[in-house]
Amino acid sequence: MVADNEPLIVDNTQEQRYELWVGEVRAGVIEYDTEPGVVVLIHTEIDPPFEGRGLATKLIAGAMEDIRARSLKVVPICPVVRAYLRRHPEDRDLVVRPSAAQ
């Protein structure tokens, strides 16, 4: 069970976004697109009343955990996700590397 103040991360596949919930309030999202074996992380947003609490980091970490559990890879388009990956080398193995042919 999750306490009311403990953030909960949910993959809303219908809307193609990871959602971060604080109690009954959706506090943030990561919008994504999918390709075979890959999740393209497009945009991260934390609602203004929840900014400055480290929730973007928790949301991205939760998304990375889910992506890893599903044996998928990541294309980080979102600058917030890219900044997270610079600070969290433990998740860099999930990033799809461009091929030499590109």
Give the location of each predicted region:
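Conserved acetyl-CoA-binding loop-helix of GNAT-fold acetyltransferases
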Residues: 52-64
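Conserved beta-hairpin
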Residues: 16-27
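Conserved N-terminal entry element of GNAT/NAT acetyltransferase domains
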Residues: 2-11
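General beta-strand recognition
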Residues: 19, 38-40
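C-terminal structural segments of small proteins and small subunits
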Residues: 65-101
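Conserved beta-strand in the GNAT
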Residues: 25-33, 40
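A short, internal acetyl-CoA/4′-phosphopantetheine-binding micro-motif in the GNAT/acyltransferase core
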Residues: 44-51
